[in-house]
């Protein structure tokens, strides 16, 4: 998938799920399931409930996403 095809949105972590999955509420109110990107996993970036994150989604399935950034 080309980078231009992805949709990036801001959201808040609602809950932590097993296997580094998270339930994220986007700014528009939509709730989706997201996992951590490989670079965040490699660098041991911790994500907790309530954190502001940037989520990358594909236009084909808007119920799943990838967390690519955690705001400080």
UniProtKB/Swiss-Prot annotation:
Record keywords: Cytoplasm, Initiation factor, Protein biosynthesis, RNA-binding, rRNA-binding
Major place of residence: cytoplasm
Residues of the S1-like domain: 1-72
GO MF, one example: translation initiation factor activity
Gene Ontology CC, one term: cytosol
Keyword hit for RNA-binding: yes
Signal peptide coordinates: none
Record-linked InterPro entries: NA-bd_OB-fold, RNA-binding_domain_S1_IF1, S1_domain, TIF_IF1
Annotated localization: Cytoplasm
Pfam families: eIF-1a
PANTHER family: TRANSLATION INITIATION FACTOR IF-1, CHLOROPLASTIC
Self-association and partners: Component of the 30S ribosomal translation pre-initiation complex which assembles on the 30S ribosome in the order IF-2 and IF-3, IF-1 and N-formylmethionyl-tRNA(fMet); mRNA recruitment can occur at any time during PIC assembly.
Family, as annotated: Belongs to the IF-1 family.
Function of the protein: One of the essential components for the initiation of protein synthesis. Stabilizes the binding of IF-2 and IF-3 on the 30S subunit to which N-formylmethionyl-tRNA(fMet) subsequently binds. Helps modulate mRNA selection, yielding the 30S pre-initiation complex (PIC). Upon addition of the 50S ribosomal subunit IF-1, IF-2 and IF-3 are released leaving the mature 70S translation initiation complex.
Record protein name field: Translation initiation factor IF-1
